[in-house]
Structure formats: structure tokens, C-alpha cells
């Protein structure tokens, strides 16, 4: 049984809020005009050709279901932890396009089969074996990433409400199916990571967009270290927008199917009703778990990962790990250093540059750039070596033998990431399924308040600490975890104004 900080019945609250928030607003602009630009969707005929089945595709690796106004996608490879492959993409993308054109599909749910995984990533072992066949195999792998990123971009710009159940392992390709959605639900079984630097690759599937936009240096930290987050920590970090117990997901899905939006509702109103419906099923956050990426650890992450060179990050971590260091995070710093020494040096350099550049990329440009980067990695030593050592041989022949073998082998000032950010003349620029794009997520308000939100509130008004926390609890309508999240931000980033009880943001 989940023991929570606050267990309260929310039935009735959501319906009351929904009735207030869903009054028609005839001046509100629709999603397509307001955020995503002119729509240029792929034709049905072109989609059928692009995603047509190929020999070897499994017939039931994805299951689709319709219940009233809800359409669901169920990844159905539980024995493989629902690892994503081309066969699955060729089923999911055309179905999403079909539902986007349907007036009957009012909410989409994506989930994984079984209790262990939502989606543990892409089937990279198959890609490494394919690459070993030579240029034709490499081309097939590059084409796979093209299909995957087309699907990721479609999800990131989707015009129907999209809800992802991150119930179980959610890594790599599974992150691409979920992270760009307005609703991302973590459970006590969720395990999140972007493990690409472990296998000589880079955080892809739109991580170039998502990670750099996280507060402080949390995104670069997650991308470089492949750090694991579990359960409610995925929610506290802002990767999930909601935290529910896994046992409530079937009932939530049934409840979402019963929602009947009015034709005149804006997308904001539709999303608000879905948000309130999800909140009905919240039973609170575990009472005995502090925020892992918070407090001293979060301050150390921001101190160490703010640099633009890997050797400067390593030096900062060594300083934090030294005996007598004032940060009080010696154990964390030592563990982080150990993790980084095991990663592909090339992957670390590419990923750090990606984190810095990605902040200025639009969502469409992100997937086009990542496609070019993936093409370079398919031809690289480290990807094929890393996947073979870790996932195919499973360590039987020792750890991966990177080239260069270690960070120390890279000469000072050498720019080994440069080539990965140049277009490959043999790889055409990726054509996406529509021309929609944006610079910030258009509906990024359903998760917990973060540093950006708290800073904005402090700068707009005079608040005492408790009044500010109460402000967020009230404006987020009692959302579980708000008090803990805002308190952590204030502990790290705010000070009391001189001579008053009001808080102000620390000078950076």
C-alpha cells in the first residue's frame, strides 16, 4: 500500500474545476495557429508508402484499441521490455496520423505491455549487428533513425491530447515516445535514464531539445552520466508531469475514455480537463522520499556541469570529491567521476556540445540535426563497440574498448565533437511528417513548479516564504508534491530580503 504525505479524495474537485475552466473562449487561438505554425501533414497515400510493412515485421508487436473517445497504443514486446524497433514504428506512426484526422479520437494513451517496462529503448543490438554487414547495413540503421525521429516529431507536435503511461523502465527510445507529450505519468515502478553515453552514442529522440531546457544543469547531468531516476524522483525532476500508483492506471484510462469535449473548446480547455481528470487519481507522494536531485546535490550539479568543456567538469567534480571540500557531496562527486570514466569519451564530448547548442534549436531542427548525428555514430567505432560489449556480449569479453580509450588521451583543446555537427553529404536532410515547430514546449504547465516558475513569481510579487509556497499550492490546485518542490527551490535559490520577511532570488 502506498503511504503518502497527503491522501485526499479529489472526486468532485476535478469536475468543479473543469466546469469553471472549460467555459468557451471564442477569442482563444487554436493550437495550430497559436503555436505550431502552418500545418502541412503528410498525405494518407504518402504515409502508407513510407510506413508500409517489410518482411520480418511482427504482426502483434503493437496493439491498438478504441474505447469511446479514447484511442490507445500498447507496445507489446514484454519479453524484450517493449524495446522499440522499425516494425513498431511502421504501425504507430500511420495510426497516429489517422487518429489526428478523426473527430472521434479525443485523447491518445500510449503504454507498455507487462509490469516491467513502458519501453526500455530502441533495439540498438539489432542496429549494431546490421552495421557489421557494411555500408548497406549502416544505411538501414540510418533509415531506422529517420523513421523513429519522424514519429518523435509527430508526437511532439501532435494536435490531439496525448498521455504517456511511464509505468516501468523508460529509457532511450521510450523517452522519445513520451517526453514531448503534455502528460507523462510516472508510477512507483518507473525507472528513467538516458543511457546512450554508456554505449558510445548520444542522447537522441529529441533530448537535444528537452534536456537543455531543464532548470540549471540537470539536463546535461542526466545526459552525460546516464543517471537513473526511479519512481517519484522522475516526477520531482520534471520528467513526469504526474505521479500515480500503477494500480490506478486502468481506471484512469476508462475515465479518460468517458470525457466528451465540446466542439468549441480550445486545446487549452481540453488539456485542462484531462489534467484535472488525472489529478482525481492522485493519492499523494511517498512521505519518506526526499528529492534526490535537490538540496546539496542539485547545487553541486549546477556548479560542476556549468562548464563547456569536459575536462573542466571533471576538474570541478574532483574539487567536490576532495577531502574537506565544503560542498558536503564528496560521495556523490566520487561516484559521478567513476561513472564518467566508464563512458565513451567521444560520446561525452558530443553530448556536452549537444546540450549547449540544443537550447537554440527548434523542435523540428532538433530531429533533423539528431538524424545527421546518428548517421555519423552508425559509422563510428564507439557505437558498435559499446553496444556489442554491453548488450550483445554482456561483458563476457570485458568492457568496451573506446577510441580514444580515455578522456586523458584527448589532447588539450582538441575538438573531437566537431564532425558530428556537420551534415553528412551522403545523408539527405530528414523530411518530417509536418512542418510544425516551436522553441519552447507549448503546454508545459502540468508538472511541478520548477526554478523558472519560482523565480518568475518572486520577481513579480512580494512574498514571504510561506505565502509563496501557499501561492503555488493554490494556483496548482492542491497538486501533490508542490509544497516539497517549491520548498527545495527556495532552500537553494532564495534568500530573505534585508530587513523584511520577503524572499528574493539569489544573485547569480
UniProtKB/Swiss-Prot annotation:
GO BP of this protein: valine catabolic process
Record's protein name: Small ribosomal subunit protein mS47
UniProt entry keywords in alphabetical sequence: Hydrolase, Mitochondrion
Compartments in which it is found: Mitochondrion
Catalytic activity of the protein: 3-hydroxy-2-methylpropanoyl-CoA + H2O = 3-hydroxy-2-methylpropanoate + CoA + H(+)
Main localization of the protein described in the UniProt heading: mitochondrion
Biological function: Component of the mitochondrial ribosome (mitoribosome), a dedicated translation machinery responsible for the synthesis of mitochondrial genome-encoded proteins, including at least some of the essential transmembrane subunits of the mitochondrial respiratory chain. The mitoribosomes are attached to the mitochondrial inner membrane and translation products are cotranslationally integrated into the membrane. mS47 has enzymatic activity in vitro, and is able to catalyze the specific hydrolysis of 3-hydroxyisobutyryl-CoA (HIBYL-CoA).
GO cellular component terms listed in the entry, alphabetical order: mitochondrion
Subunit structure: Component of the mitochondrial small ribosomal subunit (mt-SSU). Mature N.crassa 74S mitochondrial ribosomes consist of a small (37S) and a large (54S) subunit. The 37S small subunit contains a 16S ribosomal RNA (16S mt-rRNA) and 32 different proteins. The 54S large subunit contains a 23S rRNA (23S mt-rRNA) and 42 different proteins. mS47 forms a protuberance of the N.crassa mitoribosome and retains a solvent-exposed cavity liekly capable of accommodating a substrate, in accordance with it being an active enzyme as well as an integral constituent of the mitoribosome.
CDD domains from the UniProt entry: crotonase-like
Enzyme Commission code(s) on record: 3.1.2.4
Protein species of origin: Neurospora crassa (strain ATCC 24698 / 74-OR23-1A / CBS 708.71 / DSM 1257 / FGSC 987)
Name of one Pfam family that matches: ECH_2
Record-annotated disulphide pairs: none
Gene Ontology MF, one: 3-hydroxyisobutyryl-CoA hydrolase activity
Family classification: Belongs to the enoyl-CoA hydratase/isomerase family. Mitochondrion-specific ribosomal protein mS47 subfamily.
